[in-house]
Design a protein with these regions (language model features):
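ATP/NTP-dependent adenylation/nucleotidyl-transfer catalytic domains that generate, transfer
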Residues: 5-6, 10-67, 71-357
Length: 357
């Protein structure tokens, strides 16, 4: 057939890739340029938050602190914003809300971080509130399902929102661009805030921003806690801890963020199709034993499936600063119906690995 002939011609004349494909397109490879980029991004985030705090006449910036990477970055940005405004860093109110999955490591790191940054700190143990909420809705607490997890996230958002009202402040969102792409957030839970400072920053870049802050840290204690946060597995900590250790690791569930950020970059920045992105990924991650073709395919398929299925969360995002050329704000660069289907993209992938579909 004509289609078959075209396929044969395209296959036999496929251009050999000779250029280097960067596996981390969001992160500059040169250390000096990377440090300059990190400082610029942190300033952009702080500028955006400072403007919103001024415009809203907010007395406080309220942030839920988990001891994890994203909330750490949001806190660092909030401290910069307050300093920029000439206000005391105690106007940043960090709230830690331990529950069933909180570990000693993340809890301790949250406290040390807040102490070193000289912000106001409070702890709200949400366990009793969650128990009461589960009783209200008839949730069996022995069933560790989506309700068990999302219930905790929504209680945390409730506590933050009302704390902001009580203190005349606004809630600073912590979720990043990679989480928005994958829909890795609880709808109307950590998905919601009053201003999301990390919404334009992909996870691979979040790590480098925090590492940059560690490199320029004013004290050894601050540097050490930032490095330990960087070394902590990414986790929402919504399932009960096992022997005091994190039981739920995000990248085991949704896939490696370095792959998803690579896919995200070429989907949004260039609009490339699945086959082309898969080929670029093979070139970028060649020689990485943990990423054979089957694994690259698996997580690319997972990316498309989640990206389409989770658009409804991105259709109602809080405001936040635009950081780079790739963004998912429904008020900026990204227009996508929540009912869009991934069928065509998944069908193209199926042609690459028919046995994997």
């Amino acid at each position: 057939s004509l289609v078959g002939s075209e396929m044969c011609i395209r296959d036999s004349t496929e251009t050999v890739l000779t250029r280097w494909v960067d596996p981390t397109p969001f992160v500059p490879g040169d250390p000096k340029r990377r440090a300059e980029r990190c400082e610029l991004i942190l300033k952009m985030q702080a500028d955006g938050l400072a403007k919103r705090l001024e415009h809203a006449h907010a007395k406080t910036a309220v942030i839920g602190i988990s001891g994890g990477l994203d909330s750490c970055l949001a806190l660092l940005v909030a401290v910069r914003a307050m300093k920029q405004l000439g206000r005391p860093t105690t106007d940043v109110l960090a709230v830690t809300m331990p529950c069933f999955g909180t570990t000693k490591r993340t809890r301790s790191n949250a406290e040390i971080l807040c102490d070193e940054l000289h912000v106001s700190f409070t702890e709200i143990d949400i366990a009793n509130t969650v128990h009461s909420h589960f009783a209200d809705i008839g949730q069996d607490e022995s069933v560790l399902d989506v309700t068990f997890e999302n219930g905790q996230a929504r209680v945390r958002t409730l506590e933050l929102m009302d704390t902001a009202n009580r203190t005349g402040g606004l809630v600073v969102g912590t979720g990043d661009l990679s989480e928005l792409a994958l829909g890795w957030a609880t709808y109307n839970g950590d998905h919601m805030s009053m201003y999301g400072v990390n919404a334009g920053v992909p996870k691979t870049l979040v790590r480098h921003l925090v590492r940059y802050e560690a490199d320029i840290a004013a004290t050894t204690e601050l540097k050490n806690v930032l490095l330990d946060i960087l070394d902590t597995p990414v986790s929402p900590e919504l399932l009960p801890a096992k022997n005091g250790e994190i039981a739920q690791k995000t990248e085991d569930l949704v896939g490696p963020y370095e792959l998803h950020d690579f896919y995200l970059y070429y989907v949004l920045r260039f609009g490339f199709g699945p086959a082309k992105i898969f080929r670029l990924a093979k070139a970028a991650f060649a020689g990485r034993a943990e990423y054979p073709d089957e694994v690259l395919y698996k997580w690319l398929r997972n990316f498309y499936w989640r990206f389409f299925a989770q658009q409804f969360k991105r259709s109602c995002l809080p405001d936040g600063p635009k950081i780079g050329s790739v963004t998912l704000s429904p008020r900026g660069d990204w227009r996508m119906p929540s009912d869009a289907a991934a069928a065509l993209w998944l069908a193209e992938l199926e042609q690459l690995f028919p046995h994997e579909g």
